[in-house]
Amino acid sequence: MTSFVFVTGNANKLREVKAILAAGDSGIEVTSQSVDVPELQGTTQEIAIAKCKVAAEKLGTACVTEDTALCFEALNGLPGPYIKDFLANIGHEGLNTLLNGFPTTRATALCTFAYSPGPGEEPILFEGRTEGNIVPARGSKVFGWDPIFQPLEGGGRTYAEMDGEEKNKISHRYRALEKLRAYLSEQAK
């Protein structure tokens, strides 16, 4: 049995991670803990690694951190890893307004997980991407920017209009977690 602490205070993220990793009897046990880690600026990769190093030292055990980005093609990748701040300050409508006057609403949802086997160990990265478009908000507004991201393979629906199981089959988080699951399964052999 492989186990790690997923460093998050977000119940929705924890629920998604557990649901995705539970599929197929992976033998991976996930607990969670909120750890105060500095809010850094940089790429999703830099942020995930830095958070993971701090968390591993504080927890003294194997842990996983996540950084998520929503990258607008028209804005050369912005808001990127700062999506949480953009969303808090301008909301779903403001994010759509940013794209007014641009010829494209294409965006990439990017999820980067960093896994550390413990303190002093260099974190390993696992990334997942989903391509889509930014659209006016539709569906439940419970989970971040899900109402405005319409994945290309989503049948014309936003993440927020999909049930959890359906979203978890195509999401950026799912794709990154599948890579993490494969790595942990290989290490357990």
UniProtKB/Swiss-Prot annotation:
Pfam families: Ham1p_like (PF01725). Its EC number is 3.6.1.66. Binds 1 divalent metal cation per subunit; can use either Mg(2+) or Mn(2+). Coiled coil: none annotated. Keywords: Cytoplasm, Hydrolase, Magnesium, Manganese, Metal-binding, Nucleotide metabolism, Nucleotide-binding, Nucleus. Its cofactor is Mg(2+); Mn(2+). Mg(2+) binds at residue 39. Its main location: cytoplasm. The keyword Translocase does not apply. GO terms for molecular function: dITP diphosphatase activity; ITP diphosphatase activity; metal ion binding; nucleoside triphosphate diphosphatase activity; nucleotide binding; XTP diphosphatase activity. It is found in: Cytoplasm; Nucleus. Gene3D superfamilies: 3.90.950.10. One of its GO terms (cellular component) is cytoplasm. One of its GO terms (biological process) is nucleoside triphosphate catabolic process. It catalyses: ITP + H2O = IMP + diphosphate + H(+); dITP + H2O = dIMP + diphosphate + H(+); XTP + H2O = XMP + diphosphate + H(+). ITP binds at residues 8-13, 51, 67-68, 84, 143-146, 167, 172-173. Belongs to the HAM1 NTPase family. Pyrophosphatase that hydrolyzes non-canonical purine nucleotides such as inosine triphosphate (ITP), deoxyinosine triphosphate (dITP) or xanthosine 5'-triphosphate (XTP) to their respective monophosphate derivatives. The enzyme does not distinguish between the deoxy- and ribose forms. Probably excludes non-canonical purines from RNA and DNA precursor pools, thus preventing their incorporation into RNA and DNA and avoiding chromosomal lesions. Homodimer. NCBIfam families: RdgB/HAM1 family non-canonical purine NTP pyrophosphatase. This is Inosine triphosphate pyrophosphatase. It comes from Cryptococcus neoformans var. neoformans serotype D (strain JEC21 / ATCC MYA-565). The lineage of its organism: Eukaryota, Fungi, Dikarya, Basidiomycota, Agaricomycotina.
